[in-house]
């Protein structure tokens, strides 16, 4: 029997060939997997008829017919970043807009990700001005600020936003890593949603927007439609600022394929709402809470090895979190990453993928793992010796492959 586990936007399943009949078999008992397959993808009848264990899923939510599914899709992602208040010096704003081609990038990525709307950006050159504008104009969904602009820093701005009763996420975008570390060490950051590091590309702003949207929408979307979740655990600002844009870029590529498979334009629009959510955590307690809360929906974990646990850096935090994930959902792929290569044998012996942080090919290696193990790539049929016998890029090709993959393989 040849099997390959994959995730895509459908949840984790395995494709198998047995006695000449190629079928998709749910690879774990989680009801969210069956819900994902049965409600998120509008699978063609020709394929549904050959998917075992999916057409009559056992889920706590009511089974929806096609029109109800369509309406449910439209109700996903209730929180959207439509208007961004950018707080930066005129020079920093110029860099962000010109060198990063911010407006062009926002247009391009917004069209690819949801086809609905492009965030508007309003620029102000002081935190005090931003606070007054946010108070007087409730349209802003996100405030992105430098470490300090004018006579107020980002921590003070976030604090005053909360005191004013404004439910607006405040994200800090810094340009110098040393300044960021000093800022975090000297200022309370409890009112700040997240701190990011600019690394030369405006793609980080897209990652910030999607991070905020995912954080706000994940509870609603998982409950409503079983939308899958990717958990990222990293406390180093430099690293998560680097690889979050990479992960979202891979999601964008996969989303393009999903768009092409829509029944019509309206269906293509709403299906984009069901893209996987990415949750970012920076300490063990928060990560463990997310694992417990979304255990039915997590389809993969990318985690640092050493991060805060009970207030102190612990070299066991990543391994303990991975053990927890596997105890709840044994087939979920887990990637552990660290600059300490002595952890590689232990990680691989326990069945986890390993990435070396300081490797010059880190981002390339991450893309490869996302494609090969997290199902961001094609659906690949393989023989027991791992030889490839077929590949499907979308549901249409998958339906065709069901007729052509060779029979006679033994379990």
Task: Locate the predicted segments by residue.
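Alpha4 helix (beta4-alpha4-beta5 surface) of REC/receiver domains from two-component response regulators
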Residues: 152-156, 160-164, 172-196, 202-206, ...
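Structural motif
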Residues: 87-91, 145-149, 173-176, 199, ...
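Intrinsic-disorder-associated, low-complexity terminal segments enriched in Asp/Asn/His/Tyr and depleted
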Residues: 8-9, 21
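Conserved phosphotransfer microenvironments
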Residues: 65-66, 95-98, 102, 107, ...
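Non-catalytic signal-transmission and effector/linker regions of two-component phosphorelay proteins
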Residues: 10-16, 28-122, 159, 187-194, ...
């Amino acid at each position: 029997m040849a099997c390959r586990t994959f995730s895509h936007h459908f949840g984790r399943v395995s494709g198998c060939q047995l006695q000449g009949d190629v079928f998709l078999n749910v690879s774990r008992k989680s009801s969210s997997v069956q819900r994902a397959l049965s409600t998120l993808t509008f699978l063609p009848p020709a394929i549904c008829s050959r998917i075992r264990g999916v057409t009559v899923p056992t889920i706590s939510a009511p089974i929806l017919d096609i029109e109800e599914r369509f309406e449910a899709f439209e109700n996903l992602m209730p929180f959207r970043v439509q208007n961004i208040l950018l707080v930066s010096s005129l020079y920093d704003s110029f860099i962000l807009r010109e060198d990063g081609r911010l407006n062009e990038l926002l247009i391009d990525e917004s069209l690819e990700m949801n086809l609905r709307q492009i965030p508007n950006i309003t620029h102000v050159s002081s935190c005090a001005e931003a606070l007054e504008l946010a108070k007087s104009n409730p349209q802003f969904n996100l405030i992105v600020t430098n470490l300090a602009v004018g006579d107020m820093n980002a921590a003070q701005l976030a604090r005053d936003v909360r005191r004013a009763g404004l439910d607006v996420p405040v994200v800090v975008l810094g340009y110098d890593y040393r300044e960021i570390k000093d800022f975090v060490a000297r200022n309370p950051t409890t009112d700040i949603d997240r701190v990011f590091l600019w690394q030369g590309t405006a793609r980080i702003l897209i990652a910030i927007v999607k991070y905020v949207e995912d954080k706000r929408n994940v509870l609603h979307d998982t409950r409503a439609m079983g939308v899958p979740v990717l958990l990222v655990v990293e406390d180093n600002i430099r690293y998560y600022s680097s690889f979050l844009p990479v992960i979202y870029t891979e999601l964008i590529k996969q989303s393009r394929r999903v768009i092409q498979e829509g029944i019509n334009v309206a269906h293509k629009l709403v299906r984009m709402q069901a893209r996987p959510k990415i949750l970012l955590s920076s300490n063990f307690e928060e990560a463990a809470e997310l694992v417990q809360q979304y255990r039915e929906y997590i389809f993969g974990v990318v985690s640092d090895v050493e991060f805060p646990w009970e207030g102190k850096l612990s070299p066991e935090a990543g391994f303990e979190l991975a053990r927890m994930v596997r105890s709840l959902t044994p087939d979920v792929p887990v990637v552990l990453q660290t600059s300490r290569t002595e952890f590689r044998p232990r990680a691989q012996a326990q069945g986890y993928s390993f990435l070396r942080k300081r490797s010059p090919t880190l981002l390339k290696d991450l893309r490869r793992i996302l494609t090969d193990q997290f199902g961001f790539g094609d659906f690949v049929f393989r023989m027991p010796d791992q030889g490839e016998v077929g590949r499907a890029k979308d549901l249409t090709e998958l339906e065709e492959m069901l007729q052509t993959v060779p029979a006679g393989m033994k379990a």
